Regions:
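N-terminal secretory/targeting leader peptides
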Residues: 2-19, 24-122, 132-360
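Core domains of carbohydrate- and sulfate-ester-processing enzymes
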Residues: 127-131
Length: 360
């Protein structure tokens, strides 16, 4: 189930949903799984992907394969879902792999790293490159098999009590930043904080942190960050295209019939596309509403971007010298990134640059 099977299974989703294989489905046993999400139920975008996944599995199996979806904190804490899958507390988790870089930095390569791939490039690396193969080899060490479970697209750069005008403003900044990016923020003089999405607002409101990032306008507006920190930065250089994953225990997955395995993969493919579409469709209006309500947008200064890039590349070299898992996967990732960046510089960036300079 590598590369092009994602596309094949996405097509299978339509075939099975249309009832083209009732005999195959009806012959299957009843299955009940539990899914633990790392996200709050209030976010119909990022949490919603798990609902889409579970719904499609149910539909394509004729109701014989049911997955109950549980938000962060219901069954497991947001950052405890991988352990939950490993020990069999739940069969599947929906999460951002980079949350677990403390287990091994290589987890971040399955999600997002600073100045990494954008969402289209990430999906391309997974399906047509070596991404899915390499990450599955790595995740097997943790008794997990992964299926792509959505992408937010390029993110914003977070909410700040005071705008960042230069590198000097990064010094001592208590910043809630997701996953692996905290390592770079720390090298830049900041103080990274790893806080689940549902707890960020309270931390900002109480002044426990100076700044926080989550995803983008739609989610951030729902979480109310604009009420406690008026300055909104861009771009989110640490998350050009963060991929979410469905992590399934290898024993649970191996116990499924071939037909159920195909349904799981097809349902994940639908959820993957659905999440990106939701973000792309909902962020524009949310951004307009935020600005109309007093949010102040600012671009990260050049010295901040250049320092972040320099420190990121140095960090990757340091990790490659110490972690053979990272070295193997990152070497392939970096080559793919270089090739993609060269191509996107012409057709994609050329078109986007012109379009964004026009008035519609």
């Amino acid at each position: 189930m590598e590369r092009r099977s994602f596309v094949r299974q996405a097509g299978l989703a339509g075939i099975l949903a249309a009832g083209a294989a009732p005999a195959v489905v009806n012959a299957q046993a009843n299955i009940r799984w539990r899914l633990a999400s790392s996200f709050p139920k209030s976010l119909d975008t990022i949490y919603g992907a798990a609902d889409v996944f579970a719904k499609k599995v149910g539909e394509m199996s004729g109701g014989k394969f049911q997955i109950s979806v549980h938000s962060a904190g219901e069954l497991l804490p947001a950052f405890g879902v991988v352990d939950g899958v490993q020990n069999g507390t739940v069969e599947v988790a929906h999460t951002a792999p980079y949350y677990f870089f403390g287990k091994d930095e290589t987890f971040a390569l399955g999600c997002a790293i600073p100045f990494g791939l954008n969402s289209r490039q990430m999906t391309a690396w997974m399906i047509e490159g070596n991404g899915l193969k390499l990450m599955r080899e790595f995740y097997a060490n943790f008794n997990i098999i992964n299926f792509m479970g959505g992408n937010t697209g390029a993110q914003m750069g977070g909410w700040y009590r005071k705008p960042i005008n230069s590198m000097a403003d990064m010094k001592g900044l208590k910043f809630r930043v997701g996953g692996f990016a905290g390592k770079v923020v720390e090298r830049m003089g900041g103080v990274p904080q790893n806080i689940p999405g549902g707890e960020i607002y309270q931390s900002l409101e109480k002044g426990t942190i100076d700044a926080a990032e989550w995803v983008g306008p739609y989610d951030d507006q729902k979480l109310g960050f604009n009420k406690v920190a008026p300055n909104y930065a861009f771009p989110g250089w640490w998350e050009g295209g963060p991929q979410l994953d469905f992590f399934i225990g290898t024993k649970a997955f191996a116990a499924l019939t071939p037909e159920y395995k195909a349904i799981v993969e097809a349902a994940a493919a639908v959820a993957h596309v659905d999440m990106q579409a939701k973000y792309d469709a909902r962020n524009p209006l949310a951004l307009k509403q935020l600005v109309a309500g007093g949010t102040k947008l600012f671009r990260f200064p050049k010295d901040v971007m250049e320092t972040a890039f320099k420190e990121s590349m140095a960090l990757y070299e340091d990790i490659s010298a110490k972690n053979p898992n990272w070295k193997k996967v990152y070497a392939d990732y970096a080559k793919f990134r270089a090739d993609e960046t060269l191509w996107f510089r012409f057709a994609e960036a050329g078109f986007d640059d012109f379009m964004q300079s026009q008035k519609f």
